[in-house]
Amino acid sequence: MNFTIPAPFTAIHTIFDLAFTTSLDTMLGTIQEAVSAPLVACVTLWIIVQGILVMRGEIDTRGGITRVITVTVVVALVVGQANYHDYVVSVFEETIPNFIQQFSGSGLPLQTIPAQLDTMFALTQAAFQRIASEIGPMNDQDILAFQGAQWVFYGTLWSAFGIYDAVGILTKVLLAIGPLILTGYIFDRTRDIAAKWIGQLITYGLLLLLLNLVATIVILTEATALTLMLGVITLAGTTAAKIIGLYELDMFFLTGDALIVALPAIAGNIGGSYWSGATQSANSLYRRFAQVDRR
């Protein structure tokens, strides 16, 4: 029996997107319910204490009011599910993608990338099957060369798809843990964690912009050239020439794939997020511990 998926990229994208969306939405609601009651109680007590200290003159009035406003805004986002969705989730899942779509350099909607990859996959599958039927069962050299060209081509498609799909899924994961991370913004010691979380979301937003500008152009160019190149390859005189043509096709797709694979590093460097390498050096850590010792 031959089990095949007619549109593998679209099917995989739909399955993972639905699974993560359902699970993470449930987890987000659970997190907000768990932290809302103790957080509101602690913040209420903290505001009362702040008011007493301000009235006694032990805390600067302007600074105390600023802290109260900041804490109130953070708590409103963390506790209120509608507020968090309207002001945080919708910005990164709806507003930014819709805004970025207006700057597409190819006119190809980013959401159609799985369908474009499915079309290219189907076209090459037909060509691969025709060429495979011409190779004799005892011709080990041609079989090995053909399989190598086939797997390289599949690898280029899957790597481009993996980057595209990972951006959406990881953004959903970050947004799901947002209430816990934003709670840390209230405290000075954990404020850096919340800042890094925001930086990571900004990085994914930049990566989405780069994908929309670069990946759509690359994939549209590859889809346009693929039909012509497959026609030339299948009309070649010998099987060896067809296999060589497949490797030339791989080189073309690897060039475009290199541009797409480089996009996460570019977005990380621009966004200045934690995973892009913004870690402390050994000298920086040494200076920090030295300051602690002197105190």
Swiss-Prot record:
Signal peptide: none annotated. The chain crosses the membrane at residues 35-55, 68-88, 167-187, 201-221, 226-246, 251-271. The keyword Cell membrane does not apply. One of its GO terms (cellular component) is membrane. GO terms for biological process: protein secretion by the type IV secretion system. Keywords: Crown gall tumor, Membrane, Plasmid, Transmembrane, Transmembrane helix. It is found in: Membrane. It is a multi-pass membrane protein. Belongs to the TrbL/VirB6 family. NCBIfam families: PRK13852.1 (NF010426). VirB proteins are suggested to act at the bacterial surface and there play an important role in directing T-DNA transfer to plant cells. This is Protein VirB6. The lineage of its organism: Bacteria, Pseudomonadati, Pseudomonadota, Alphaproteobacteria, Hyphomicrobiales. The gene is virB6.
